[in-house]
Amino acid sequence: DRLRSRGLGDVYKRQDKDRFRSKYLDIPNEPLYPFGYGLSYTTFEVSDIHLDRTWMDTSGQIEAEVTVKNTGNCTGTETLQLYIHDIAASVVRPVRELKDFKKVTLRPGEEKKVVFTITEQQLLFLTENGIYESEAGEFEIFIGKDSSTDNKASFVLKK
């Protein structure tokens, strides 16, 4: 009852004749809640990211600043999360890696500037040789309330 699939090498498709299986799903192909999602009794707004510079060398650092505002009616705490994506690495890298987070408690209507410092240490990854190193190139950073944020900026690491 096993048929060999064309073009898949040693992969086999199992075809059970006593069951019906549809491969069509009419649901979104995404998690119900993104990583870092949290409930709150109030709402928050996060400004666009402002970088103090658009490039750094291996001994430097970049400061990424956002303003978070409590737009609700209750005092609340928001966890801002910093994700980094290496656009073109020599090995496959995650789409977004959580590198830092900061908790901010705000009263209704209050806003606060939050600064994340990015160093080469946060850009290191394990190479095929088993060594942690960074590579020159372009990086994207995302700052928001969870991993699905579209709030991004980019910078270049020069070596």
Where are these regions (language model features)?
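Single conserved hydrophobic/aromatic residue that forms the stacking wall/gate
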Residues: 1-12
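Intrinsically disordered, low-complexity Ser/Thr/Gly-rich stretches
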Residues: 10-159
